[in-house]
């Protein structure tokens, strides 16, 4: 039986690969997509997500979500993903539109209609998920678990300690981590290992139309990294759903720093139990890289 999932995303180049896997992995049933401001503005992430759904002819409803963090000023990653978030490929024009309600309400409505609890997957800032949990707490029993790409037990990627998706809205992440729902965190500890090799990247244009499109996106903004390999951060959250055997997880207490002058957005991961608090997150700490690479090749070969 396919696993029903809702995907909250901020495409973004590596989001495009994760979305492809969510659509084409035969084990998954992607039923709803929502967008959030993150890599670029929410207007741009929504446009990019609709372009991808049209590219794959995927009839999946999409709702536009939060334009700004819960409390603080927005930040983006346009320096990595470009001003549009997904330039480099000539997508065909379309007339698709998002649903007419905010993302967190679309998630609420879909959860309440679902015949069984649904797995939420969040690969951008956690603003929409925090709004859902704070404004619609009656939804919690209908959430099977939340799988996120975000955080780190060690180094950060936008500050010395903080990973971008958490740092973009620390208050939202703190709300989510305190919520009591089951959480699996695929942070930089594993995503920095999730590298597609230059040899494999070179084969993408001949793989299928998806490979050609992804290669164009990668080449446009990450041409230098193409020679050393590309990290597939967001894809790890999808990979865990399908191949949890590739990941080493440890239950830990995790809190989000929201006050520190130098540490705001840091996920404080108590690996050794120093704080004596009960674990609230299953933290991915290691990855079978070869197995991951093989799985990626298999799922992208289906993405035609």
UniProtKB/Swiss-Prot annotation:
Keywords from the named record: Glycosidase, Hydrolase
Top-level taxonomy: Bacteria, Pseudomonadati, Pseudomonadota, Gammaproteobacteria, Enterobacterales
Gene designation per UniProt: rihC
Any one GO MF annotation of this record: uridine nucleosidase activity
One family name in Pfam for this protein: IU_nuc_hydro
Alphabetical list of SUPFAM superfamilies matching this protein: Nucleoside hydrolase
Enzymatic class: hydrolase
GO cellular component, one term: cytosol
Physiological role: Hydrolyzes both purine and pyrimidine ribonucleosides with a broad-substrate specificity.
Source organism per UniProt: Escherichia coli O9:H4 (strain HS)
EC number: 3.2.-.-
Protein known as: Non-specific ribonucleoside hydrolase RihC
List of catalytic residues: 233
Transcription regulation among keywords: no
InterPro entries xrefs: I/U_nuclsd_hydro_CS (IPR015910), Inosine/uridine_hydrolase_dom (IPR001910), IUNH (IPR023186), Nucleosid_hydro_RihC_nonspecif (IPR022976), Ribo_hydro-like (IPR036452)
GO biological process terms, semicolon-separated: purine nucleobase metabolic process; purine nucleoside catabolic process; pyrimidine nucleobase metabolic process
Domain of life of the organism encoding this protein: Bacteria
Family the entry assigns: Belongs to the IUNH family. RihC subfamily.
């Amino acid at each position: 039986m396919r696993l029903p999932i809702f995907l909250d995303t901020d495409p973004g180049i590596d989001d495009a690969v994760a979305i492809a896997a969510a659509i084409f992995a035969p084990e998954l049933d992607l039923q709803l997509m929502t967008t959030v401001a993150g890599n670029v503005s929410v207007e741009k992430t929504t446009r990019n997500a609709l372009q991808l759904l049209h590219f794959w002819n995927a009839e999946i409803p999409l709702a536009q979500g939060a334009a700004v963090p819960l409390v603080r000023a927005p930040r983006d990653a346009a320096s990595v993903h470009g001003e549009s978030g997904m330039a480099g490929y000539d997508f065909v024009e379309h007339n698709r539109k998002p649903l007419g309600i905010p993302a967190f309400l679309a998630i609420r409505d879909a959860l309440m209609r679902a015949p069984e609890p649904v797995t939420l997957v969040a690969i951008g800032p956690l603003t929409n998920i925090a709004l859902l949990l704070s404004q619609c707490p009656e939804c919690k029993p209908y959430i099977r678990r939340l799988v996120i790409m975000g955080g780190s037990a060690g180094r950060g990627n936008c500050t010395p300690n903080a990973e971008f998706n958490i740092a973009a809205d620390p208050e939202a992440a703190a709300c989510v981590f305190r919520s009591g729902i089951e959480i699996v965190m695929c942070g930089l500890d594993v995503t920095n290992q999730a590298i597609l090799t230059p040899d494999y990247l070179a084969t993408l244009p001949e793989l299928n139309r998806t490979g050609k499109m992804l290669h164009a996106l990668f080449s446009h903004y990450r041409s230098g990294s193409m020679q050393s390999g590309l990290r597939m951060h967001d894809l790890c959250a999808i990979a865990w759903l399908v191949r949890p055997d590739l990941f080493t997880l440890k239950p830990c207490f995790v809190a989000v720093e929201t006050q520190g002058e130098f540490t705001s957005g840091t996920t404080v991961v108590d690996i050794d139990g120093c704080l004596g608090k009960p674990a609230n997150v299953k933290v991915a700490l290691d990855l079978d890289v070869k197995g991951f690479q093989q799985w990626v090749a298999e799922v992208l070969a289906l993405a035609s």
